[in-house]
């Protein structure tokens, strides 16, 4: 039996994140326009920007999937035909859709554009997938609450021509496949229209009815608990299991995350998938450096979601609230020549610091800052100015644009 070659599907919140995803090996990217997407926080793409983004992606052999996955009311539907026609004209490779009314409009106003069913739809069984296939969908993004065995059951009952996509990395909602109303109730921001204020991440206390003004923290440990704040998902060490279940597209969450996040996570999963395909086996594990990469971004503690059964206690609920930030971008490479590296500073670093240079598809390069100089050629003991250029000795050949990072644990 042929082994599935899974697609690495990366987020692209703006043009810079699009370039990062493509450079670091994404097979496809997903992005939003200025309307009808579930992420209002990223810059997203205007109609003209979308056309340019699609052209750039296609020049590099990368597909573009456009989000159209809000749950619109009747008034919003009136604006949809123009949006769909513009998306079709831009040449997007698929529309990601939640609502059946939007699907109907897509078949009418963008009939040549493939339809992918969003995880928001909550597809958890093959009958739903077959019905959506009959309505014209070519791919489903599975409900996030499924185990690997349930994914395999879903895949086996789906039409063979239909593809199965699954989130494998990133933030998770404590709601059914992302359908949540907390934001609507508490901040009047519509979570199913791209405006979620993430109240599940807030710190909550209890108040007893007769003791007004006396607040009691909801505690699990001495540091308390954020009762609805889930860990982040990470499945980089379980690629054989995902492929065996029939998943043909590995989706990375994070359109609102940074360019650095996009680059690192895309690079890690691209490298891990390629390593597996080069020597497939049931006991495959990615190289240590590939796993380490996903710990060098801002992240919450990791878990495997529902893939291996319903989460229990510390497997899912997160007790600290904030992000883990043990690495930061120190600089971006500008040019490398004659044993000297020129960089553009992003965070302060010092003479003698050990820095890592992120490499595409291979282990990072560790260097020590020696002979640090400012743009005037003067020797300095640190690089304090954001965006300013500095040079230091470096024998390695470093491509322009490479991320150079520093462990904050060593400060």
Residue ranges of predicted features:
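Active-site beta->alpha loop and helix N-cap motifs at the rims of alpha/beta catalytic domains
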Residues: 2, 14-17, 35-126
